[in-house]
Structures are given as structure tokens and as C-alpha cells.
């Protein structure tokens, strides 16, 4: 029997992990870059992927001087590229089985 560990972070912990201010987290949430559970910032709970996403978002915002809307789009496109690469790799493996026969 296997169990799944679910990690959730509150606002303070997320800010510490991602080295981001609460004001930026609120702004990033407003643009849909990360989506917490809870109604207010005091109640927000984030999943374990949120610190990485926040760090990437802040880096794009600062280094490329993108507005948050542009950051959201860039992150969405980067995720889509990663998914396509994974799918392509899987399809290559499946195709390789047929060509080795």
C-alpha cells in the first residue's frame, strides 16, 4: 500500500522558499500564474510547485522586463513546450519498437 505525501505551503512559507515578497505573490496570483486554495491571502495555501513557478516568474519579470501578463504567457508556453517534448520522446520510443522488428 502506497501513500502520497501532499505538501502545502502557507503565504509566509512560500515567500521564504521563493524569496519573494507577499505583495508580489498577491500580484502574481491576480494574474493567474499560481493558483492557491483559499479566499484571502491569509487563507491561501499553495502546492509544492509554487516556489519554483514563482522564482521563474520573478526571473522573467526582472531579467526580461516582462509585464506579469507576458510572464503568464511565457510560462504557459514553456510548459506546453515541455509537454510536447515529453510526448515526442514517448512517441519516438514507441516508434523505435516497431523499427527494431
Curated annotation (Swiss-Prot):
Alphabetized InterPro entries for the sequence: CbpM
Residue ranges the record marks as coiled coil: none
Family: Belongs to the CbpM family.
Protein purpose: Interacts with CbpA and inhibits both the DnaJ-like co-chaperone activity and the DNA binding activity of CbpA. Together with CbpA, modulates the activity of the DnaK chaperone system. Does not inhibit the co-chaperone activity of DnaJ.
Name under which the protein is recorded: Chaperone modulatory protein CbpM
Taxonomic lineage of the native organism: Bacteria, Pseudomonadati, Pseudomonadota, Gammaproteobacteria, Pseudomonadales
